[in-house]
Amino acid sequence: MTSILTNIAAMAALQTLRTIGSNMEETQAHVSSGLRVGQAADNAAYWSIATTMRSDNMALSAVQDALGLGAAKVDTAYSGMESAIEVVKEIKAKLVAATEDGVDKAKIQEEIDQLKDQLTSIAEAASFSGENWLQADLSGGPVTKSVVGSFVRDAGGAVSVKKVDYSLNTNSVLFDTAGNTGILDKVYNVSQASVTLPVNVNGTTSEYTVGAYNVDDLIDASATFDGDYANVGAGALAGDYVKVQGSWVKAVDVAATGQEVVYDDGTTKWGVDTTVTGAPATNVAAPASIATIDITIAAQAGNLDALIAGVDEALTDMTSAAADLGSIAMRIDLQSDFVNKLSDSIDSGVGRLVDADMNEESTRLKALQTQQQLAIQSLSIANSASENVLTLFR
């Protein structure tokens, strides 16, 4: 039936043309944006996942920047520690040279002073972005420095920032700005007090050098005696005793003229009365602190071996600290590589969810353009039908 009021063919062609136009707009949006899910209306689930993962990826980008900053801090501290180790090696060499008879210790001390100033300069300059890991205030105990390591979202959706920690303590900083507990300003107890006793047994005199208890460490007379030396007590029964073959024998200080020497090899015990033929010779090593080394002082000049031992212990601590910094640097490098790969993986995963396949979209767009042309032709034909009706009235 032909109607002049309703052109059903034209209406159908127009509806087809509208549908094709809508599909073309969608396809053109995909082509222009590169996304097949550009908004929640396209696919709510995929859009939600992609939005969350993009947010996490931005956080990982910030972590990457923080790792770069942390690596710079660690590298600065390591370079400073490495330079300080070389300087301390020079100080050790100067002390060894000072042991030679006839050398001018004052001249050597001048060189040591310059090296000590260089150590201070290194510690003060080893700072990056206001952070100095070679000197710190340790009055409140160890100080923990942290470097952002990663951004984590667990299975429950909770997020957290993981950190890489490094402790600034007496074995890792060169100087304690609030005291004397850093590697270079603390005192190394390299030698304990000793007493040399000349012992006369039946006319034969021998000398024995032994370590002794400190004056404030008294041995209880009822305690088991295992070879340590006892000091004189106080009171009516002044003195400490050791048991020899079932009998208690009084043990007295080295300042007294008589000594009780006890021998115990596990199976045999015996005691010998001795007589000190002269004042016992004592030896107390001078404290060894690199920051206070001054071999022009008699007490230190006479204990160069102790000073060298102290410097060697400081070198051991510095080497250990440098190794720790190297380990932290390696961990940061590994973490940085991992964060890069993780970020790439997230980008790839998000792309699979929301990116448009440009080959598919371009092919679809070409097909829709062809369909649009055909729909226009169809609409044109449908509209011309009314003109055919007019010819009937001519």
UniProtKB/Swiss-Prot annotation:
Primary location recorded for the protein, binned into one broad class: secreted
Family: Belongs to the bacterial flagellin family.
Key words of the record: Bacterial flagellum, Secreted
Protein name as catalogued: Flagellin B
Cellular component aspect of the GO annotation: bacterial-type flagellum; extracellular region
UniProt GO MF annotations: structural molecule activity
Membrane-spanning residues: none
Species of the source: Rhizobium meliloti (strain 1021)
Compartments reported by the entry: Secreted; Bacterial flagellum
Record-linked InterPro entries: Flagellin, Flagellin_C, Flagellin_N
Function: Flagellin is the subunit protein which polymerizes to form the filaments of bacterial flagella.
